Swiss-Prot record:
Its EC number is 4.4.1.11. Substrate binds at residues 114, 376. The modification N6-(pyridoxal phosphate)lysine is found at residue 212. Belongs to the trans-sulfuration enzymes family. L-methionine gamma-lyase subfamily. It comes from the Bacteria. Transmembrane segments: none annotated. Its cofactor is pyridoxal 5'-phosphate. Pfam families: Cys_Met_Meta_PP. The keyword Amino-acid biosynthesis does not apply. Keywords: Lyase, Pyridoxal phosphate. This is L-methionine gamma-lyase. The lineage of its organism: Bacteria, Pseudomonadati, Pseudomonadota, Gammaproteobacteria, Pseudomonadales. Pyridoxal 5'-phosphate binds at residues 59-61, 89-90, 209-211. GO terms for cellular component: cytoplasm.
Protein backbone atom coordinates (compact mmCIF):
# COMPACT_ATOMS: atom_id res chain seq x y z
CA UNK A 1 0.00 0.00 0.00
CA UNK A 2 1.01 3.60 -0.56
CA UNK A 3 2.56 4.80 2.73
CA UNK A 4 0.95 8.21 2.39
CA UNK A 5 -2.60 6.90 2.48
CA UNK A 6 -2.65 3.42 4.02
CA UNK A 7 -3.45 4.56 7.56
CA UNK A 8 -6.27 6.92 6.65
CA UNK A 9 -9.96 6.10 7.13
CA UNK A 10 -12.15 4.39 4.57
CA UNK A 11 -13.57 7.45 2.83
CA UNK A 12 -10.21 9.20 2.74
CA UNK A 13 -8.67 6.19 1.01
CA UNK A 14 -11.64 5.97 -1.36
CA UNK A 15 -10.99 9.57 -2.43
CA UNK A 16 -7.19 9.88 -2.33
CA UNK A 17 -5.48 6.49 -2.27
CA UNK A 18 -2.57 6.06 -4.66
CA UNK A 19 -2.72 9.46 -6.36
CA UNK A 20 -0.66 12.64 -6.00
CA UNK A 21 -1.88 15.63 -8.00
CA UNK A 22 1.52 17.32 -7.81
CA UNK A 23 3.04 14.39 -9.69
CA UNK A 24 0.44 14.83 -12.45
CA UNK A 25 0.78 18.48 -13.49
CA UNK A 26 -1.37 19.53 -10.55
CA UNK A 27 -4.47 17.80 -11.94
CA UNK A 28 -6.73 17.24 -8.94
CA UNK A 29 -8.57 14.44 -10.76
CA UNK A 30 -6.44 11.58 -12.13
CA UNK A 31 -5.95 11.74 -15.91
CA UNK A 32 -7.66 9.17 -18.11
CA UNK A 33 -5.21 7.31 -20.33
CA UNK A 34 -7.33 6.70 -23.42
CA UNK A 35 -4.81 4.61 -25.32
CA UNK A 36 -4.68 1.01 -26.43
CA UNK A 37 -0.88 0.75 -26.57
CA UNK A 38 2.26 2.37 -25.14
CA UNK A 39 5.59 3.29 -26.77
CA UNK A 40 8.88 1.87 -25.48
CA UNK A 41 11.95 4.07 -25.03
CA UNK A 42 14.15 1.17 -26.15
CA UNK A 43 13.76 -2.34 -27.51
CA UNK A 44 15.44 -3.64 -24.37
CA UNK A 45 12.88 -1.93 -22.15
CA UNK A 46 10.08 -3.45 -24.23
CA UNK A 47 11.60 -6.88 -23.84
CA UNK A 48 11.73 -6.33 -20.09
CA UNK A 49 8.02 -5.44 -20.04
CA UNK A 50 7.09 -8.61 -21.90
CA UNK A 51 9.28 -10.68 -19.57
CA UNK A 52 7.74 -9.11 -16.48
CA UNK A 53 11.07 -7.59 -15.48
CA UNK A 54 9.89 -3.99 -16.01
CA UNK A 55 6.82 -2.47 -14.37
CA UNK A 56 5.83 -0.25 -17.27
CA UNK A 57 2.67 -0.45 -19.35
CA UNK A 58 2.70 -1.76 -22.90
CA UNK A 59 -0.88 -2.74 -23.83
CA UNK A 60 -4.16 -1.80 -22.16
CA UNK A 61 -5.52 -5.35 -22.26
CA UNK A 62 -2.85 -6.11 -19.65
CA UNK A 63 -2.43 -2.83 -17.80
CA UNK A 64 -3.11 0.89 -18.05
CA UNK A 65 -2.29 3.71 -15.58
CA UNK A 66 -5.97 4.58 -15.06
CA UNK A 67 -6.90 0.97 -14.39
CA UNK A 68 -3.84 0.48 -12.19
CA UNK A 69 -4.97 3.32 -9.92
CA UNK A 70 -8.46 1.84 -9.65
CA UNK A 71 -7.02 -1.60 -8.88
CA UNK A 72 -4.70 -0.31 -6.15
CA UNK A 73 -7.51 1.74 -4.62
CA UNK A 74 -9.85 -1.27 -4.50
CA UNK A 75 -7.10 -3.40 -2.94
CA UNK A 76 -6.64 -0.72 -0.28
CA UNK A 77 -10.37 -0.65 0.50
CA UNK A 78 -10.61 -4.45 0.76
CA UNK A 79 -7.30 -4.68 2.67
CA UNK A 80 -5.90 -6.97 -0.01
CA UNK A 81 -2.56 -7.01 -1.78
CA UNK A 82 -3.64 -6.44 -5.38
CA UNK A 83 -6.66 -5.90 -7.61
CA UNK A 84 -7.57 -6.70 -11.20
CA UNK A 85 -10.25 -4.73 -13.05
CA UNK A 86 -12.68 -6.18 -15.60
CA UNK A 87 -15.41 -4.95 -17.93
CA UNK A 88 -18.14 -6.68 -15.89
CA UNK A 89 -18.68 -8.64 -12.72
CA UNK A 90 -19.18 -11.80 -14.76
CA UNK A 91 -15.84 -11.12 -16.45
CA UNK A 92 -14.21 -11.02 -13.02
CA UNK A 93 -15.92 -14.23 -11.89
CA UNK A 94 -15.24 -16.08 -15.16
CA UNK A 95 -11.56 -15.09 -15.19
CA UNK A 96 -11.19 -16.28 -11.59
CA UNK A 97 -12.80 -19.65 -12.33
CA UNK A 98 -10.96 -20.24 -15.62
CA UNK A 99 -7.61 -19.33 -14.04
CA UNK A 100 -7.80 -21.26 -10.80
CA UNK A 101 -9.73 -24.40 -11.84
CA UNK A 102 -8.74 -27.27 -14.13
CA UNK A 103 -10.60 -30.27 -15.61
CA UNK A 104 -11.19 -32.81 -12.87
CA UNK A 105 -11.24 -30.20 -10.10
CA UNK A 106 -14.30 -29.69 -7.90
CA UNK A 107 -15.87 -26.40 -6.88
CA UNK A 108 -18.34 -26.27 -4.00
CA UNK A 109 -20.88 -23.46 -4.25
CA UNK A 110 -23.77 -22.28 -2.13
CA UNK A 111 -27.22 -23.49 -3.15
CA UNK A 112 -28.45 -19.95 -3.84
CA UNK A 113 -26.48 -18.01 -6.45
CA UNK A 114 -26.85 -15.18 -8.92
CA UNK A 115 -28.43 -16.68 -12.05
CA UNK A 116 -25.59 -15.80 -14.43
CA UNK A 117 -23.01 -17.31 -12.07
CA UNK A 118 -25.14 -20.47 -11.96
CA UNK A 119 -25.16 -20.53 -15.77
CA UNK A 120 -21.38 -20.03 -15.95
CA UNK A 121 -20.85 -22.92 -13.57
CA UNK A 122 -23.09 -25.37 -15.40
CA UNK A 123 -22.82 -24.23 -19.02
CA UNK A 124 -19.25 -22.92 -18.84
CA UNK A 125 -16.69 -24.55 -16.60
CA UNK A 126 -18.97 -27.50 -15.87
CA UNK A 127 -18.88 -28.51 -19.55
CA UNK A 128 -15.07 -28.41 -19.50
CA UNK A 129 -14.65 -31.04 -16.82
CA UNK A 130 -14.98 -29.09 -13.57
CA UNK A 131 -17.37 -30.78 -11.13
CA UNK A 132 -19.84 -28.39 -9.46
CA UNK A 133 -21.32 -29.31 -6.07
CA UNK A 134 -24.16 -27.30 -4.51
CA UNK A 135 -24.53 -27.31 -0.73
CA UNK A 136 -26.37 -25.29 1.88
CA UNK A 137 -23.45 -23.33 3.33
CA UNK A 138 -25.43 -22.32 6.38
CA UNK A 139 -24.96 -25.99 7.33
CA UNK A 140 -21.23 -26.26 8.02
CA UNK A 141 -21.40 -30.03 8.50
CA UNK A 142 -22.89 -30.41 5.02
CA UNK A 143 -20.11 -28.25 3.60
CA UNK A 144 -17.36 -30.18 5.34
CA UNK A 145 -18.80 -33.50 4.19
CA UNK A 146 -18.78 -32.28 0.58
CA UNK A 147 -15.04 -31.49 0.55
CA UNK A 148 -13.04 -34.20 -1.18
CA UNK A 149 -9.54 -34.75 -2.57
CA UNK A 150 -10.42 -32.99 -5.83
CA UNK A 151 -12.02 -29.91 -4.21
CA UNK A 152 -10.10 -26.78 -5.19
CA UNK A 153 -12.50 -23.91 -4.53
CA UNK A 154 -15.41 -22.83 -2.33
CA UNK A 155 -17.51 -20.03 -3.80
CA UNK A 156 -20.46 -18.10 -2.41
CA UNK A 157 -22.22 -14.77 -2.11
CA UNK A 158 -23.13 -13.29 1.24
CA UNK A 159 -25.81 -12.05 1.38
CA UNK A 160 -26.97 -14.38 -1.38
CA UNK A 161 -28.86 -13.10 -4.40
CA UNK A 162 -31.85 -12.89 -4.22
CA UNK A 163 -33.01 -14.46 -0.94
CA UNK A 164 -30.50 -12.71 1.41
CA UNK A 165 -29.14 -15.90 3.00
CA UNK A 166 -25.86 -15.22 4.82
CA UNK A 167 -22.80 -17.45 4.97
CA UNK A 168 -20.38 -17.36 7.90
CA UNK A 169 -17.20 -16.22 6.15
CA UNK A 170 -14.84 -16.90 9.05
CA UNK A 171 -16.25 -20.37 9.74
CA UNK A 172 -16.20 -21.46 6.08
CA UNK A 173 -12.69 -20.10 5.61
CA UNK A 174 -11.47 -21.93 8.71
CA UNK A 175 -12.88 -25.22 7.40
CA UNK A 176 -11.42 -24.62 3.93
CA UNK A 177 -7.95 -23.84 5.19
CA UNK A 178 -7.62 -27.15 6.98
CA UNK A 179 -7.32 -28.54 3.44
CA UNK A 180 -4.28 -27.78 1.30
CA UNK A 181 -4.72 -25.66 -1.85
CA UNK A 182 -8.41 -24.96 -1.18
CA UNK A 183 -9.31 -21.40 -2.18
CA UNK A 184 -12.28 -19.45 -0.78
CA UNK A 185 -13.79 -16.97 -3.25
CA UNK A 186 -16.56 -14.59 -2.17
CA UNK A 187 -18.80 -12.30 -4.20
CA UNK A 188 -18.95 -9.15 -2.07
CA UNK A 189 -21.16 -7.15 -4.46
CA UNK A 190 -24.09 -6.70 -2.07
CA UNK A 191 -21.93 -5.35 0.75
CA UNK A 192 -18.92 -3.63 -0.83
CA UNK A 193 -15.80 -3.25 1.33
CA UNK A 194 -17.55 -0.50 3.27
CA UNK A 195 -19.92 -3.01 4.90
CA UNK A 196 -17.91 -6.24 4.80
CA UNK A 197 -14.28 -7.20 4.13
CA UNK A 198 -14.05 -10.96 3.51
CA UNK A 199 -10.25 -11.05 3.25
CA UNK A 200 -10.03 -9.91 6.87
CA UNK A 201 -12.26 -12.86 7.82
CA UNK A 202 -10.10 -15.46 6.07
CA UNK A 203 -11.24 -15.51 2.43
CA UNK A 204 -8.62 -15.74 -0.32
CA UNK A 205 -10.31 -13.90 -3.19
CA UNK A 206 -13.03 -11.24 -3.35
CA UNK A 207 -14.97 -10.53 -6.55
CA UNK A 208 -17.30 -7.62 -7.24
CA UNK A 209 -19.77 -6.58 -9.83
CA UNK A 210 -18.58 -2.98 -9.63
CA UNK A 211 -21.56 -2.12 -11.84
CA UNK A 212 -23.60 -1.99 -8.66
CA UNK A 213 -22.85 -0.09 -5.44
CA UNK A 214 -19.19 0.62 -6.19
CA UNK A 215 -20.12 2.61 -9.28
CA UNK A 216 -23.42 3.72 -7.80
CA UNK A 217 -24.90 5.42 -10.86
CA UNK A 218 -26.14 2.61 -13.16
CA UNK A 219 -24.12 3.98 -16.08
CA UNK A 220 -21.26 1.49 -16.51
CA UNK A 221 -20.58 -2.22 -16.21
CA UNK A 222 -17.40 -3.24 -14.41
CA UNK A 223 -15.90 -5.94 -12.23
CA UNK A 224 -13.00 -6.20 -9.78
CA UNK A 225 -11.03 -9.03 -8.18
CA UNK A 226 -8.98 -8.41 -5.03
CA UNK A 227 -6.64 -11.05 -3.64
CA UNK A 228 -2.99 -11.71 -2.79
CA UNK A 229 -0.39 -10.61 -5.32
CA UNK A 230 0.48 -14.09 -6.62
CA UNK A 231 -3.14 -14.95 -7.45
CA UNK A 232 -3.82 -11.49 -8.89
CA UNK A 233 -0.86 -11.91 -11.25
CA UNK A 234 -2.22 -15.24 -12.47
CA UNK A 235 -5.75 -13.89 -12.90
CA UNK A 236 -4.44 -10.89 -14.85
CA UNK A 237 -2.08 -12.77 -17.16
CA UNK A 238 -4.28 -15.83 -17.72
CA UNK A 239 -7.88 -14.95 -16.93
CA UNK A 240 -7.87 -11.37 -18.23
CA UNK A 241 -5.17 -11.28 -20.92
CA UNK A 242 -5.62 -14.72 -22.48
CA UNK A 243 -8.91 -16.34 -21.47
CA UNK A 244 -11.61 -13.66 -21.33
CA UNK A 245 -10.21 -10.38 -22.65
CA UNK A 246 -12.84 -8.70 -20.45
CA UNK A 247 -10.94 -5.42 -20.27
CA UNK A 248 -12.42 -2.39 -18.55
CA UNK A 249 -12.11 0.80 -20.59
CA UNK A 250 -10.07 3.61 -19.01
CA UNK A 251 -13.08 5.91 -19.28
CA UNK A 252 -15.28 3.49 -17.33
CA UNK A 253 -12.48 3.06 -14.78
CA UNK A 254 -12.54 6.85 -14.32
CA UNK A 255 -16.32 6.80 -13.78
CA UNK A 256 -15.98 3.91 -11.34
CA UNK A 257 -13.38 5.75 -9.27
CA UNK A 258 -15.64 8.78 -9.23
CA UNK A 259 -18.45 6.63 -7.83
CA UNK A 260 -16.20 5.02 -5.22
CA UNK A 261 -15.42 8.44 -3.75
CA UNK A 262 -18.98 8.70 -2.41
CA UNK A 263 -19.42 5.02 -1.54
CA UNK A 264 -19.58 5.44 2.24
CA UNK A 265 -22.11 8.28 2.06
CA UNK A 266 -24.32 6.38 -0.36
CA UNK A 267 -24.18 3.10 1.55
CA UNK A 268 -25.18 4.83 4.77
CA UNK A 269 -28.29 6.18 3.00
CA UNK A 270 -29.11 2.88 1.27
CA UNK A 271 -28.91 1.09 4.62
CA UNK A 272 -30.90 3.59 6.67
CA UNK A 273 -33.74 3.67 4.13
CA UNK A 274 -33.77 -0.11 3.73
CA UNK A 275 -34.05 -0.54 7.50
CA UNK A 276 -37.21 1.60 7.59
CA UNK A 277 -38.75 -0.15 4.58
CA UNK A 278 -37.96 -3.62 5.95
CA UNK A 279 -39.70 -2.77 9.22
CA UNK A 280 -42.73 -1.44 7.34
CA UNK A 281 -42.93 -4.63 5.25
CA UNK A 282 -42.57 -6.85 8.31
CA UNK A 283 -45.60 -5.17 9.85
CA UNK A 284 -47.73 -5.32 6.68
CA UNK A 285 -50.57 -7.89 6.63
CA UNK A 286 -49.97 -8.75 2.95
CA UNK A 287 -46.41 -9.90 3.63
CA UNK A 288 -45.60 -13.47 4.65
CA UNK A 289 -41.99 -12.82 5.69
CA UNK A 290 -39.13 -10.35 5.23
CA UNK A 291 -35.45 -11.21 4.85
CA UNK A 292 -33.32 -8.25 5.86
CA UNK A 293 -30.16 -8.59 7.99
CA UNK A 294 -31.03 -5.52 10.05
CA UNK A 295 -34.25 -6.98 11.49
CA UNK A 296 -33.95 -8.84 14.83
CA UNK A 297 -36.39 -11.37 13.33
CA UNK A 298 -33.89 -12.22 10.56
CA UNK A 299 -32.73 -15.80 11.28
CA UNK A 300 -29.05 -14.87 10.88
CA UNK A 301 -29.25 -11.51 12.64
CA UNK A 302 -26.38 -12.36 15.00
CA UNK A 303 -24.13 -13.39 12.10
CA UNK A 304 -24.98 -10.20 10.23
CA UNK A 305 -24.03 -8.17 13.28
CA UNK A 306 -20.66 -9.94 13.46
CA UNK A 307 -19.50 -9.75 9.86
CA UNK A 308 -21.33 -6.74 8.40
CA UNK A 309 -20.88 -3.12 9.48
CA UNK A 310 -24.47 -2.29 8.40
CA UNK A 311 -27.25 -4.52 7.01
CA UNK A 312 -27.17 -3.26 3.42
CA UNK A 313 -29.65 -1.84 0.96
CA UNK A 314 -31.23 -5.06 -0.35
CA UNK A 315 -34.50 -6.55 0.91
CA UNK A 316 -36.24 -9.80 0.01
CA UNK A 317 -39.83 -10.45 1.04
CA UNK A 318 -42.60 -12.92 0.32
CA UNK A 319 -46.08 -11.70 -0.58
CA UNK A 320 -49.11 -13.73 0.40
CA UNK A 321 -50.79 -14.91 -2.78
CA UNK A 322 -47.77 -16.26 -4.65
CA UNK A 323 -47.07 -15.55 -8.31
CA UNK A 324 -50.23 -13.53 -8.98
CA UNK A 325 -49.69 -11.29 -5.96
CA UNK A 326 -46.06 -10.73 -6.87
CA UNK A 327 -46.92 -9.71 -10.41
CA UNK A 328 -49.76 -7.40 -9.33
CA UNK A 329 -47.54 -5.69 -6.78
CA UNK A 330 -44.73 -5.22 -9.28
CA UNK A 331 -46.99 -3.79 -11.97
CA UNK A 332 -48.53 -1.31 -9.52
CA UNK A 333 -45.22 0.29 -8.48
CA UNK A 334 -44.79 3.87 -9.67
CA UNK A 335 -41.52 5.11 -8.15
CA UNK A 336 -39.61 1.83 -7.90
CA UNK A 337 -38.50 0.83 -11.40
CA UNK A 338 -39.11 -2.75 -12.55
CA UNK A 339 -35.53 -3.65 -13.42
CA UNK A 340 -32.69 -6.03 -12.67
CA UNK A 341 -29.42 -4.84 -11.13
CA UNK A 342 -28.98 -2.80 -7.96
CA UNK A 343 -26.77 -0.28 -6.24
CA UNK A 344 -27.70 2.89 -8.14
CA UNK A 345 -29.41 6.03 -6.92
CA UNK A 346 -32.75 4.79 -8.27
CA UNK A 347 -34.80 2.23 -6.32
CA UNK A 348 -35.45 -0.98 -8.25
CA UNK A 349 -37.82 -3.91 -7.76
CA UNK A 350 -37.81 -7.32 -9.33
CA UNK A 351 -39.91 -10.46 -9.09
CA UNK A 352 -37.44 -13.33 -9.62
CA UNK A 353 -40.08 -15.94 -10.51
CA UNK A 354 -41.28 -13.72 -13.38
CA UNK A 355 -37.97 -12.13 -14.32
CA UNK A 356 -34.48 -13.43 -13.56
CA UNK A 357 -35.52 -17.02 -12.78
CA UNK A 358 -38.51 -17.29 -15.11
CA UNK A 359 -36.83 -20.04 -17.18
CA UNK A 360 -36.49 -22.28 -14.11
CA UNK A 361 -39.11 -24.94 -13.44
CA UNK A 362 -41.16 -24.63 -10.26
CA UNK A 363 -39.07 -27.41 -8.73
CA UNK A 364 -35.80 -25.71 -9.68
CA UNK A 365 -36.93 -22.41 -8.20
CA UNK A 366 -37.95 -24.12 -4.97
CA UNK A 367 -34.60 -25.91 -4.79
CA UNK A 368 -32.73 -22.62 -5.04
CA UNK A 369 -34.93 -20.69 -2.61
CA UNK A 370 -36.89 -18.74 -5.23
CA UNK A 371 -40.51 -18.76 -4.10
CA UNK A 372 -43.44 -17.61 -6.24
CA UNK A 373 -44.25 -14.51 -4.21
CA UNK A 374 -40.64 -13.44 -3.64
CA UNK A 375 -39.89 -9.79 -4.40
CA UNK A 376 -36.43 -8.23 -4.24
CA UNK A 377 -36.03 -4.52 -3.56
CA UNK A 378 -32.85 -2.56 -4.23
CA UNK A 379 -33.43 0.53 -2.11
CA UNK A 380 -32.07 3.69 -3.70
CA UNK A 381 -31.40 7.21 -2.51
CA UNK A 382 -34.83 8.82 -2.90
CA UNK A 383 -36.69 10.37 0.02
CA UNK A 384 -37.83 7.60 2.33
CA UNK A 385 -41.38 9.00 2.61
CA UNK A 386 -41.81 8.70 -1.16
CA UNK A 387 -40.53 5.13 -1.21
CA UNK A 388 -42.85 4.09 1.62
CA UNK A 389 -45.80 5.72 -0.11
CA UNK A 390 -45.08 3.88 -3.35
CA UNK A 391 -44.92 0.51 -1.60
CA UNK A 392 -48.14 1.22 0.29
CA UNK A 393 -50.08 2.23 -2.82
CA UNK A 394 -48.80 -0.86 -4.67
CA UNK A 395 -49.96 -3.06 -1.78
CA UNK A 396 -53.42 -1.51 -1.96
CA UNK A 397 -53.55 -1.93 -5.74
CA UNK A 398 -52.45 -5.55 -5.40
CA UNK A 399 -55.31 -6.26 -3.00
Amino acid sequence: MNDKHKNFGFSTRAIHYGYNALENNGALIPPVYMTSTFAFPTVEYGAGCFAGEESGHFYTRISNPTLALLESRMAALENGEAGVAFSSGMGAIAATFWTLLRPGDEIIVNRTLYGCTFALLHHGIGEFGVVVKHVDMSNLAELEAAIGPATRMIYFETPANPNMQLVDIAAVSAIAHTHNDLIVVIDNTYCTPYLQRPLELGADVVVHSATKYLSGHSDITAGVVVTRQSLADRIRLQGLKDLTGAVLSPHDAHLLMRGIKTLALRMDRHCSSAQVIAQMLQDHPAVEWVAYPGLPSFPQYALASRQMKLPGGMIAFELKGGMAAGQRFMNALQLFSRAVSLGGAESLAQHPASMTHSTYTLEERAKHGISEGLVRLAVGLEDIADLLADIEQAMKAMA
